[in-house]
Structure formats: C-alpha cells, structure tokens
Amino acid sequence: VGSEMCIRDRYIKMALEEDINSEDISTNAVMPEYKKGEVTLLAKQDGIIAGLQVFKRVFTILDPNTEVIFAEKDGNQIKDGDAVTNGQVLATVVGDIRVLLSGERTALNYLQRMSGIATYTNNVAALLKGTNTKLLDTRKTTPCMRIFEKYAVRAGGGNNHRYNLSDAVMLKDNHIDAAGGVAKAIQMAREYASFVCKIEVETENLDMVREAVEAGADIIMLDNMSPELMAEAIKIIDGRAKTECSGNITKENIETITKLGVDYVSSGALTHSAPILDISLKHLHPID
C-alpha cells in the first residue's frame, strides 16, 4: 500500500506540473492573495463513482490545509464503488481559493476518468452476474494512468489481469513466433520463470490449443474465436487448464460465451473505451 501511494503521488505531481507549469496566470490575475473559499462537487450523470481519494489528494498536494468533505448517502460517507445520480452532491472542497481553482481540472480529470471506467466495468460485470466467469481488464491502459485505471476497474466490480510484464508469463503471437512455436515457447518459459509463475498462452486456432494443452500451459487464452470455435477449444482443454476468452467480446455475445463455461473474460475496452462520467465543481464562493 505504501509503495502504491508513492507511485500515485508521483503521477499526480506530474499531472499538476503538466497543467500548472510555472504558474496559473488566470487565477493569479483574479486572486493575487489568500482568500478562503469552498466549492461543491456535483455528479451530472448517473454512474459508479471511483477516484475520490485521488481527487482529494490533488488538492492536498497543492496545499495540505485543503479540506475535502465527502457527502453522506443513506447515513454513510460516500465511497468508491457507490452508485451516484445526476445532481447528487458528492463533496465540498474548502481551502485557499487559488488552490481550488488551480487544482480543479487535474482533480476532475482523474475523477471523471476513473468513474467512467468504474461505470463501464459495472455495466459489463452485470452481464456476468450469476455465472462463475470472472471479468478481467488488460494492459491496454493510458500511459502513467494504469494504477488509477486498474483501481477503477476493481471499484466497478471487475478484476485485474497482469499489472505489468513482470507479474506473470503471457505468451502472445509474437512471442510464439520468436520462439519457434507454442510448445517451444512454453518450454523456454518454464525453464526461465519461477516454478510458482503461471504461464498463459494466447491461441488463435484449435491446433494451437492442442499444442498448448499438451505442453502444460496453465491458462489458455482463446483469442478472437467465434463461440462455436470456443466450444470446441473448451472440449479439447477439458479442464486441464484455465480458459480465458478475449477479443470480439460484445454485450450481445457475452452471455453465450459465459454459458460455455469459460473461466475468464478479458476486455481491453474497460480501460481504453470507457467514456468519462460527467462530474463538475460548481458554486465557488468565498467564506469567512
């Protein structure tokens, strides 16, 4: 947790430096001196909220004295993973008006992006409810946003696949081509990686599936296969490896796919295609 917070803070500071640069000219022009103020955080769309602590951290990095007071819902303070509705007050931010103005865009960028991913993930996860199939994300994330985007997937009810390349072995088409075949790639991975390291292999046809099973792959990804081809592949695997389907996954065919008994469904769309959730800071005013 400590290292995650350090990584998070490093990226937030980079984002603030990117946006503010040497100074916030507009704010310094209209607010040359300290004045205490408050502003209201409002949801402008129904969805799942995620990134509240990141939103808060943007302001406290700029000024540790900034207060972010999260609203209550049903007697409990609002938290990541909660459903929010259009017009709902999410928080009040109190502090130096210059900080509220300069941090606004960066704080909202994180909160809108993360809440959009959580909302999109939640909608897809609802289609898997009642099944044993787990929904996974991918590494198709925005550079320097992975820690935030993968967190948002979890907040929306999904699960994280590999966080980075050192987490597990995944042999994709180019790895297999470079090694000289499925069996050879698996053999080389077994010899190189720790014995506790899972080996996943991406397959595109039934011959590759057979080769991966016989070579002892732990997880076999069925990439861009039709439901009919997946059914054949699952018969071949016959429980000897975990199964993951990826590519060509739509709301229309996901129910058919889960009925095949696949263990995992992975979708890059959770992070690369989720629209933002509309959230804004409104009604900024000075207070005594």
What are these regions (language model features)?
Residues 3, 8-215, 219, 228-236, ...:
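Acidic/glycine-rich phosphate/pyrophosphate-binding loops and surrounding catalytic core
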Residues 224, 253:
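C-terminal active-site rim and adjoining tail of enzyme catalytic domains
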Residues 241:
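A short helix->loop->beta-strand "cap" motif at the edges of active sites that frequently abuts
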Residues 250:
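Glycine/proline-rich, positively charged
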Residues 269-288:
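Short, charged, intrinsically disordered terminal tails
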